[in-house]
């Protein structure tokens, strides 16, 4: 199984980078930017292919999606060649440093994501994953991969939905890639999801982070190199996103979003030709489309980070004008700021945005607590990271002293405000206005704050390194040496200073520290421990390995075309997405709502009476169900594991016993049963 995971990881890298590299090759002469943008183009091409194939009625699979995506990427490449003729020589100056980024990220990803897995196919059993895995499964079954038709019940005709299904847009970039990978390799869906998540953490994120640091610091090699050790040490991003809820699509879109920043900065850079600006502009537009497919709130995340940059660029562009009057840069900055506010308000009031911006998450901490988390980099609800807090503070002070970097400090302050509001404020118009684009979810906003803090942490690390080098110079160690010795000593100081910074950053990854009788857990130790607990597939899990094994045996006994009535809160809601079982109830919520089908209500509440009630028989017939699956008899376990469970809603199923009229035992193992419906 672990070899299968390795195979899936390698396959995923090919899926994300071969088409994307073809498409991005002609748009930038810098290899690091090309590689950073490759997965953005690939994800866009797969989603676009799924949409087109859905419109023309072609069954989507790896065999039909991949050729279409390759053709689309080739078209993108040819357009880039036409725009950027003649092609500039390739700039590979940062490739070696990018490799360092990836190597470090691989080590961290293995520790934080792979080792906590309870087997390569284990998964976190939460609400988000019911939908995420279920949507990918529906793609594979239905062959309809359109993001406008995503649903747990959007399947071939003949299978009824127990809930009113309204085909609407849902960002399904993550689901599409998982479906492509599963279709290509034939491996389990959960294993393919783990492979893709690992690639996001270990490949997409570090490459995009390297390109991000390079573009905002004008490709300063010292800062880019230090970024390799600084960018992975903030636990809130991307690592926490893989553990909380978990937010796989946001982890993908935020990680790739760092590459989109490069296109935006390149479009507004002082240097570069008109063709370069056009190329970066088109890449930026493709990136925004990719965000639309992956997770649209990434657009607002990047916007929150780059608002100060835009205002600063407006000032600088006008100030550099030869005919500029003294007040015009200020006017330009004000107009830019007003335009951004108006765009924010316009988006906030769009009708289709209301379900998002009006959604509310309860506060996770107090106002003083959220401020403390920001100052000590312990957000969201993580153990503090003193090293990173010190680097961010030093970088913040330095950025405020330089007109070229002051926007970074302002960006961090704004994102810190967003986090404090989302984490501590009760429902209010201000909270919805400022953080509604992220569902007012403090975990998502914490990732935005972490991204805004990356440049400051790099500046802080640079200052620390220069301070250490300066200590050596101040001691005049080489005043009486020849030239060669001076060079050796200089390089030694540079190496020692870099080593000190590396060791400082490495402290962030220490799982725990023992101080006498006190054990202090580090942020990454906390994530690894929590992830290990959430990934368990033991009998204490909602859907355990033994239950999954029973479901597979049950599927062998159920004729093709028949569905299985289940009680989802015994863990069987995951039987559909993980094991491809045709269960009727496959969502975590919606039962008892206005959107539930009356037949569904009747089945939930009165299935045990099927032997004498014709209305129950008719309801069962409407779902094409011939069997009943029960995995757990103890309602207390369902209460403890799923807060949405209300035992009184499921008495029609949970009351069925081996001697209930109208049912026949087909399989049994402990409390687990598969019944055949006899009437």
Name what the model sees in each region.
Residues 56-63, 119-127, 186, 239-252, ...:
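Membrane-helix boundary/interfacial segments in multi-pass membrane proteins
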Residues 11, 17, 24, 476, ...:
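Extracytoplasmic
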Residues 108-255, 531-541:
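Active-site lumenal/periplasmic loops and adjacent helix-entry segments of GT-C-fold
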Residues 1-95:
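Membrane-embedded, hydrophobic transmembrane alpha-helices
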Residues 310-311, 316, 385-409:
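Hydrophobic, aromatic-rich transmembrane alpha-helices
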Residues 302-335:
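Perimembrane helix-loop-helix junctions
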Residues 38-51, 101-111, 167, 183, ...:
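Membrane-embedded helix bundles of polyisoprenyl
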Residues 333-341, 464-521:
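Signature aromatic-anchored transmembrane alpha helix within multi-pass, membrane-resident enzymes
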């Amino acid at each position: 199984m672990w070899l299968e995971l390795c195979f899936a990881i390698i396959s995923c890298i090919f899926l994300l980078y071969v088409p994307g590299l073809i498409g991005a090759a002609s748009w930038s002469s810098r290899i690091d930017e090309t590689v950073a943008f490759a997965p953005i183009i690939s994800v866009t091409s797969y989603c676009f292919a799924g949409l087109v194939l859905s419109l023309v009625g072609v069954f989507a699979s790896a065999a039909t999606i991949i050729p279409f995506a390759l053709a689309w990427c080739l078209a993108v490449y040819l357009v880039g060649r036409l725009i950027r003729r003649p092609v500039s020589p390739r700039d590979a100056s940062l490739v070696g440093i990018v490799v360092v980024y990836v190597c470090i990220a691989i080590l961290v990803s293995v520790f934080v994501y792979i080792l906590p897995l309870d087997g390569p196919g284990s998964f976190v059993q939460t609400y988000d994953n019911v939908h995420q895995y279920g949507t990918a499964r529906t793609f594979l079954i239905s062959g309809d991969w359109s993001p406008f038709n995503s649903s747990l019940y959007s399947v071939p005709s003949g299978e009824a939905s127990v809930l009113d299904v309204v085909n609407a847009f849902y960002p399904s970039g993550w689901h599409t890639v998982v479906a492509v990978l599963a279709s290509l390799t034939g491996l389990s869906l959960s294993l393919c999801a783990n492979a893709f998540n690992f690639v996001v953490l270990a490949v997409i994120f570090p490459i995009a982070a390297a390109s991000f640091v390079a573009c905002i610091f004008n490709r300063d090699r010292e800062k880019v190199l230090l970024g390799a050790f600084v960018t992975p040490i903030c636990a809130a991003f991307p690592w926490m996103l893989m553990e909380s809820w978990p937010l796989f699509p946001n982890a993908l879109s935020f990680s790739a979003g760092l590459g989109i920043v490069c296109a935006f900065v390149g479009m507004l850079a002082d240097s570069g030709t008109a063709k370069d600006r056009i190329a970066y502009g088109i890449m930026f537009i493709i990136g925004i489309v990719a965000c639309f497919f992956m997770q649209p709130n990434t657009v607002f995340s990047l916007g929150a980070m780059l608002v100060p940059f835009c205002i600063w660029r407006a000032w600088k562009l006008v100030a550099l004008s030869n005919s500029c009057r003294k007040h015009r840069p200020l006017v330009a900055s004000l107009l830019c700021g007003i335009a951004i506010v108006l765009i924010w308000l316009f988006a906030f009031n769009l009708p289709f945005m209301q379900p998002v911006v009006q959604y509310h998450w309860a506060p996770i901490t107090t106002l003083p607590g959220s401020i403390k988390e920001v100052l000590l980099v312990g957000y969201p609800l993580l153990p503090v990271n003193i090293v990173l807090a010190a680097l961010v503070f030093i970088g913040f002070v330095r950025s405020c002293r330089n007109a070229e970097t002051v926007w970074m400090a302002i960006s961090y302050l704004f994102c810190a405000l967003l986090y404090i509001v989302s984490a501590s404020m009760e429902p209010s118009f201000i909270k919805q206005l400022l953080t509604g684009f992220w569902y007012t979810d403090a975990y998502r906003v914490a990732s935005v704050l972490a991204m805004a803090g990356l440049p400051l942490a790099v500046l802080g690390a640079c200052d620390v390194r220069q301070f250490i080098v300066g200590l050596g110079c101040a001691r005049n160690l080489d005043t009486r040496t020849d030239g060669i010795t001076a060079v050796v000593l200089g390089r030694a100081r540079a190496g020692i200073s870099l080593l000190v910074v590396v060791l400082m950053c490495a402290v962030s990854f220490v799982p725990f520290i023992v101080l006498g009788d006190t054990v202090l857990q580090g942020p990454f130790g906390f994530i690894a421990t929590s992830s290990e607990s959430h990934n368990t597939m033991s009998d204490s899990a909602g859907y355990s390995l033994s239950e999954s094994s029973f479901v597979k045996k049950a599927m062998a006994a159920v004729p093709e075309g028949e569905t299985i009535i289940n009680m989802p809160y015994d863990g069987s809601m995951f039987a559909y997405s993980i094991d491809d079982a045709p269960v009727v109830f496959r969502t975590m919520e919606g039962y008892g709502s206005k959107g539930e089908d009356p037949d569904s209500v009747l089945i939930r509440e009165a299935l045990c009476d099927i032997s004498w009630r014709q209305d129950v028989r008719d309801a069962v017939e409407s779902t094409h169900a011939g069997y009943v699956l029960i995995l757990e008899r103890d309602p207390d376990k369902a209460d403890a594991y799923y807060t949405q469970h209300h035992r009184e809603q499921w008495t029609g199923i949970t009351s069925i016993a081996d001697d209930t009229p109208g049912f026949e035992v087909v399989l049994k193992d402990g409390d687990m049963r598969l019944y055949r419906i006899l009437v």
